[in-house]
Amino acid sequence: MLLVLNVNNTNTLIAIYSLHADGSTDELRATWRISTRQGQTADEYGILVRSLLASEGLVCEAVRDVVIASVVPPLDWTLRQFCERYFTSKPIFIGPGVKTGLPILTDHPTEVGADRVANCIGAFHRYGGPTIVVDFGTATNFDVVSRKGEFIGGAIAPGLNISAEALFARAARLPRVEIRKPAKMIGTNTVDNLQIGLFWGHIGLVDSILERMISELGHDVKCVATGGLAQVLAGESKYITEVNETLTLDGLRLVYEAQRASREKSGGNRGA
């Protein structure tokens, strides 16, 4: 089996795929979303992942390879230790210097996060291009992949939860509120007012950026949502036509397949 970890600032998404002898992957066996904690130890990760696998009737010993995309550098060493201690292989970290097969046509390609690279690879494989991926996470990322399958840039905005926490932290009389679609547009109490402003304000931000990106691209564009808040927000967008919650994971799986094929071609096959 192939274990995939997408480590973000707020949540970590974990997935397990079937892995065949030739290095190909297909069936997504299970996914889990856990909180990201920088103080977590390698053994805590090991105990947690072992328990998650057991809940699906799976065991750590069946995991042949691990691929990781992390935007939390302080956790990288811990994750490496966790993988080497609980599995039989060193993890593959997707980051600068790792060939992904995705041309990155930006001013500073090494600055592009692994999750954004994976989003574009997954999107182009599934939908072709041009495609815009809106990733509703800690930040709301807009990742643009061209008709030729190139990452040509995008945008980064504060995520909805960050905006809500900023209001709570900086305005003494404003409470922390649940993120959900408001029942009406004119609020009659503070909680309603906050939910209306946060929810519809973020939808307005997303659609405003998408409208201008689509205009700049100049042709038909597919807009896809992923990330922890995609199911909450995407349905209200005028431009997002699909939610794909496993898009980043699928992109990481495809990078793994390309990496394994490259190693085998160059004589660096690690074996099963």
Curated annotation (Swiss-Prot):
Which cofactor is recorded for it? NH4(+); K(+)
Q: What class of enzyme is it?
A: transferase
> Pathway of this protein?
Cofactor biosynthesis; coenzyme A biosynthesis; CoA from (R)-pantothenate: step 1/5
Kindly list the positions annotated as binding substrate.
Answer: G113, A114, D115, R116, T190
Keywords tagged on the record? ATP-binding, Coenzyme A biosynthesis, Cytoplasm, Kinase, Metal-binding, Nucleotide-binding, Potassium, Transferase
Q: How is the cofactor bound?
A: A monovalent cation. Ammonium or potassium.
Q: Name one GO molecular function term.
A: pantothenate kinase activity
Reactions this protein catalyses? (R)-pantothenate + ATP = (R)-4'-phosphopantothenate + ADP + H(+)
BP GO annotations: coenzyme A biosynthetic process
Name any one Pfam family assigned in the record: Pan_kinase
Give the annotated active site.
D115 (proton acceptor)
What's this chain's function? Catalyzes the phosphorylation of pantothenate (Pan), the first step in CoA biosynthesis.
Regarding protein family, the annotation reads: Belongs to the type III pantothenate kinase family.
Q: How does it assemble?
A: Homodimer.
Q: What is this protein called?
A: Type III pantothenate kinase
